[in-house]
Amino acid sequence: MANPKLLIIDDDAGIRAQLKWGLDDFDVITADSRQMAIEQLEFNQPPLVTLDLGLPPDVEGTSEGFAILQAILERAPNTKVVVVSGSDEKINSQKAIKNGAFEFFAKPVDVVQLRLILERAYTDYQSLK
């Protein structure tokens, strides 16, 4: 069986590389913008996504990240999105879950814990098939 596809959306190349390396039991694809994320989502149809909220052009805020979350769930409602962010944890974690994210994971990233969350998300995704 092939590894599950995972789309990592983050504007920080170092974080994308760290997650890709640390989550090698997934078929990782990456994006650093909304346009690239939507293209990768439509082309690869990953069941799993990690999403940083602080993306350009709103690096200091979260509007772009929440817009991407909405776009993902409109196009692929069964996709399990794990928001991975360091922005205003409590407020944004509640907002992310309310808006359809599977889970919120605060930075800095612990890859072992994130892997467990992604495995649980993939199990949940498979149960919807």
What role is predicted for each listed range?
Residues 91, 109-118:
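C-terminal output helix
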Residues 119-129:
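The C-terminal output helix
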Residues 30-48, 52-56:
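Acidic, metal-coordinating helix/loop segments flanking the phosphotransfer/catalytic sites
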Residues 63, 67, 87-103:
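Alpha4 helix (beta4-alpha4-beta5 surface) of REC/receiver domains from two-component response regulators
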Residues 13-29:
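Two-component/phosphorelay signaling modules centered on CheY-like receiver
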Residues 39, 60-78:
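Short amphipathic alpha-helix used as the core "switch/output" element in two-component signaling
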